[in-house]
Structures are given as C-alpha cells and as structure tokens.
Amino acid sequence: MQIYKVGGAVRDRLLGRPVTDIDWVVVGASSDEMLARGYRPVGADFPVFLHPQSGEEYALARTERKSGRGYGGFTFHASPEVTLEEDLTRRDLTINAMAEDEQGRVIDPYGGQADLEARLLRHVSPAFAEDPLRVLRVARFAARYAGLGFRVAAETLALMRQLAESGELQALTPERSWKEISRALMEPNPEVFIQVLHDCGALAELIPEVEALFGVPQPAAHHPEIDTGVHVLSVLQQCARHRQPLSVRWACLLHDLGKGLTSEADWPRHIAHEARGVPLIDAVNQRFRVPRECQELARLVGEYHTHAHRALELRPNTLLELLQSFDVYRRPQRFEEFVAASEMDARGRLGLEQRDYPQAAYLLGAAQAARAVSVKPLVEKGLKGAELGEALKRARLAALKAYKEERGKA
C-alpha cells in the first residue's frame, strides 16, 4: 500500500503558490483495508475515504472508461492492481497529473513539470475529449493562471473545439455548468475564461447570447474598443481588478445582451438594447439555474445600467422610480451592487479604465437621502394604507429634489 499526494497540491507547490486542499491517492489497497485502518467511506460512485485524523480525502487508484454521454457517462474500476500511472492518465491536464511520494519525490509520467516551465495547459491523453466538463475546467484554469503567462496548448484547444462541435456540452447538467462558470468568474482573469470558450466554439454552445456580441460594433465615441464582445471582456477584467463579488461579475457578463439583437442596419447604435436584453438575461439565468440573487441583479443591471450612466441628468421622479425598482429601502446592498456593476461597465472601455465615475457617489447619496425619510411622522398623523404610501412617496421625492439641488450647488 503506497500513498501519494496528487493533483493541485503538487502543481501549486511547484508553482510556489499556497496549497489549500490536498488530495491523496492510495495504490495497492482495497476498500476493506482502508476500513480496517479507520478510514471513513464517503464516495458514492468510487471508493473515496476520509482520513481518521486529518479528514482529508484518500481515493483508491482507479481507471475510467467512457460508457455514456456527458461528464457522468463513465464506468470506474478501482482495485489494488491499478497503478499510479494508470490513475494519473485519467486526469485532464499534465500539470494536474503529477504525484508526490512520502519522501517528497515528484512522479511525473506525462511531462507536467515541463509544461509548468513552458506555461502550457496541455491534455494528458486523447481521452480528454470524452469528458465535456473538461472544456470548462481548462478555460477556468486558463483564467486562474493567465497572470503567470499560461496559455492553452494548440492541440488541447483543438480537442476542446472537437468537444464543442460534438454536442456533448449539451449533456452537462445546469448545476455542474454553473459551478464551473461561477468559479471561473471569480478567478483573477475571468475574461480569459470567456475568451477561451469563444476561441474553441464552446461559448456559442453554452451561452450563445454572449457569443452573439462578438463582432457587433458600438459607437467609437463611447466605446473606443468598438466590438461589444471585447467590451464585455474588458468589463469582466475591471470586475476582477476591483474585487467585485460573483453577483456583480455575472451581471456584467450579461448586461449588454440586447446589443446582440440590434439589426445591422442600425449599427453602431443600440437604441433600447436594455429592454431587449431582459428576456435574454432571463433565459440564460434559467438555463443554468442561477442563484436568485445573481438572477435578480443581472436582470436589473441589464435593464437600468444606462440610467446609472445618466444619473446626473435624471429628474428626481425618475431617480425615485429607479430606487423603488431596486427596493432600495429594504435591500440597499442590491442597489450598491448595481452601482458597482454600472461603474465597471463605464470603466471597461479601451483607454477609459481610470476615468472618474461621479455617478456612483451621486446614486449612493441619492439612495441615502431617500432612505433617510422616516415614515414615523406620517403614521403619527394617522395616515395609513394607500394614503400613507403616497405621502411617503412625496416625502422621498422632496428629499431627492433637495439632494439634487444641493449637489448642483456643489
């Protein structure tokens, strides 16, 4: 029985990065032997055990064989006869197919160390093309390690393109796809994730609404980068630089979907693209069963982001309607995230990344002014029901008028 550290822990140590999770593989042991040593079984599909002291996962060495569609269409075989090399060959990338023995020696049968040096994300074997989830995983690793100079090997990108064309991506469950997408959007370079999916044809299969933005021009005066797809990539880059949460990053990815529906005859203008985009945003949200808070923010950002850009010009009653659309009185954080997403949109433009965005402070100040209006005096006057609601609305409108006048003087 031999125990090896495998996968990400070995990779990240060699890269000089912090090692968080450690996975272990056990060669030459059976399930009965693991149980006899006090390990607790947790694997439903194949033998995985928790260490009795550390709680870390130990998996019996196994092989896998394609037996159906999708990432779940595999038959696994675990036995004491399975070698370490056989276990490593089923892994996706060479940099993830290394092991370390108990003396700290690296076992690297597929050239993972050489690919680390060359900064290449390369598949281990042609079996890579059997698992559609690997398309998303490789794109996610590209987003994680882009800052270190990593790129997807040409032959691996070709296999990813083959998978995209095969229709296998459609076999991925919404939950599994969302798990990979959401993790990738939180990587240091989320725009690289989308770019890689675009380059291999997978974006057209998974989120065709975003794919449709590439090649769609915008007015150069407002968008020096011109291409809407490139703009979305730039906005995601700004999200990462400003450490925005997942909800903001997801909203930014989808905020301009309506531009993909603009007739070529109307290019480069995109009048009413906000409203046109809302049904598309809803469709993408439903496709991946996105968490509610991400769904709601994406929809609102898509519909109202140009309101944010014109915030200083909005009349008090329009500003009040905007605040009410976000239920800013009960959910102030959602409005703050909307403002953040709008600012990322404004900064995600070639050469304008550092420009001021006074609309952010103005909108947050307006929300504060409206929320400062107390309902208590109105209740004490005996107002209730619809009458109370109208009085409260008038009071908030007055507060916003005063706020706008005061800001105008400043």
Swiss-Prot record:
Keywords: ATP-binding, Hydrolase, Magnesium, Metal-binding, Multifunctional enzyme, Nickel, Nucleotide-binding, Nucleotidyltransferase, RNA repair, RNA-binding, Transferase, tRNA processing. GO terms for molecular function: ATP binding; CCA tRNA nucleotidyltransferase activity; CCACCA tRNA nucleotidyltransferase activity; cyclic-nucleotide phosphodiesterase activity; magnesium ion binding; phosphatase activity; tRNA binding. CTP binds at residues 8, 11, 91, 137, 140. It comes from the Bacteria. GO terms for biological process: RNA repair; tRNA 3'-terminal CCA addition; tRNA surveillance. CDD domains: HDc (cd00077), NT_ClassII-CCAase (cd05398). It catalyses: a tRNA precursor + 2 CTP + ATP = a tRNA with a 3' CCA end + 3 diphosphate; a tRNA with a 3' CCA end + 2 CTP + ATP = a tRNA with a 3' CCACCA end + 3 diphosphate. InterPro entries: CCA_bact (IPR012006), HD/PDEase_dom (IPR003607), HD_domain (IPR006674), NT_sf (IPR043519), PolA_pol_head_dom (IPR002646), PolyA_RNA-bd (IPR032828), tRNA_CCA-adding_enzyme (IPR050124). ATP binds at residues 8, 11, 91, 137, 140. Monomer. Can also form homodimers and oligomers. Comprises two domains: an N-terminal domain containing the nucleotidyltransferase activity and a C-terminal HD domain associated with both phosphodiesterase and phosphatase activities. Belongs to the tRNA nucleotidyltransferase/poly(A) polymerase family. Bacterial CCA-adding enzyme type 1 subfamily. This is Multifunctional CCA protein. It comes from Pseudomonas aeruginosa (strain ATCC 15692 / DSM 22644 / CIP 104116 / JCM 14847 / LMG 12228 / 1C / PRS 101 / PAO1).
